[in-house]
Amino acid sequence: MKRVLLAEDDPDTATAIKTALEERLPITVDHVTNGALVLDQILATHPDLVILDVSMPGLNGIDVFDLLRGSPSLVDVPVLFLTAMPDLARQASARFGISDVMAKPFDCDALAQRVDDMLARVAKVA
């Protein structure tokens, strides 16, 4: 079973995302509430995909992404950004090579499709 790590500080949004993805796809979603916990969780669970909220307390999603890309063992982890600031995320995507960006609010079916597509791309590369 595929594993996804969700970094989202809003508990209602996190619950909605986790429920929507696990109901629609054969995946397990692990959740952390802030950017500082992401790296430890990645090392502990080895997710197939990381979903990052851009605006989190402590380390924001862009900071976390920068740390991921700076670590040789984590550089290839695919990342999906969720943001209420799509222009900022698109700029970061172009600058840092972010795998994908999705604007909030989003449709749960569209999110599940995007996650499924990204996981399929990862499977083809592996």
Spans of model-derived segments:
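Conserved acidic carboxylate
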Residues: E8
